[in-house]
Amino acid sequence: MTGGDISPLPRENFPMQACIIGRNSPRLLKIFLYLICLLSISSSAFAEELDLQLLIDAALRNNREMLAAQSRVGAYTYRIPQAGSLPDPMFTFGYQNDTLSSYTYGQSPDSKWIFELSQTFPFAGKRGLREEMAKADAESQKAAYEALQRRVISKVSENYYDLFFAYKSLDIIGDRKALFSSMEEAALARYSSGMASQQDAIMAQAEKYMLQEKEEMLRQKIQTLEGMLNLFVGRDTSLPLGRPSAAREARLYETLGELVKKAYDRSPEIRAKEKMIAGAEAKVNMSKKEYFPDVTLNAGTDQRGGDYTNMYKLTASINLPVFFSTRQEPAVKEAQAQLLETKHELEATKLMISSSIRENFAMAASAQRLMALYRNALIPKSTQDYEAALTAYSNGKADALTVVTRLKALIEYEVLYWNQFSERQKAIARIGAYTGDLAQ
């Protein structure tokens, strides 16, 4: 298949002669050619029929945005032990001499080697709060990753059904072009017998050419959709895909209220915001802990040498939060404001999810009703009208415009039927991204 060809190659076009390996061929060459044949056949099978589940599986494995999010989750997870760890201890060493002119170690009581070790201990509870904040951030990223998974599945499903609809539209237009050809033949027959003007045949030809224009536009749309699907599954966007297999009709069995409740219970977006709130609450508590000082313990020895006794010391130092009005108090207010912001974001997320589910539920229900209308009433009636108009035109009892109008209406209703089918499938996929009931 070339880059510009969107239709899958028929099985008979594959160079199967290349798969015939002579007995005198070297062993390695035989193995190599055999593998090439297997890859060619498997690739052609993938190109002939496109399965939604295979696309979803490929996207979950290879989508670049998801791989980046997965690495981000790992990075945040590694922050947890860092946040709960003690600061590194400090080792200090040096030498103090009595004069600048000579080395007086062991000769003067003021000459000595100094060795000290110090360790800072945060005030009780600070390390636990820092670890709690880091853990909440990591869990929020995990929930965000799950939400991204669902969005990717939903987007793959949406583009898949758009591609399905584009191919269905091509089928309809291809079939109906034959009907315009029949009308053209009837118009030419009537024109040759003097029963109609040449304008009737020209009208049929013009409509047929307009359908060819739509075919070309659909082929361009198919290439665009294939590029989008390749992007989601992590493949080269120029690679062709096959035709979507027969789509399984999705159904909604819950009421609107049940779907909204399920989304609230299962939505990773909501869970991510809840984890962010937990982290913000820990930050508020942490900022309040900053009013209390940390303690630094220092142990050291002065080695004086000679007849002088060595000296040992143990000290403790604390930081004094004397500038609390410009440091600790604003920090507490900042953390409280961020907590309030996160709570508002949670409520906004719930409203957004509820609104989106309501919108897509209405779209799915409307599409279901319209499909029934097209399938049971408009398409059968339009088919009868077209057949009656064509028969009447052949008998000289109707004009060409009537036949063209009836046929265009039939094409429009058939395309609209499959458009509503595609829109319903996409709406249900979007709902599934919130509830977790994704059609895979």
Regions found by a protein language model. Give the residues of each.
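Small/polar-residue-enriched beta-strand and adjacent coil segments characteristic
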Residues: 89-147, 271-349
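Bacterial N-terminal signal peptides
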Residues: 30-42
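Short, charged, amphipathic alpha-helical segments
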Residues: 132-135, 198-206, 400-408
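Bacterial Sec-pathway N-terminal export signals of envelope proteins
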Residues: 46-95, 102, 120-121, 129, ...
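N-terminal secretory signal peptides that target proteins for export/translocation
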Residues: 1-28
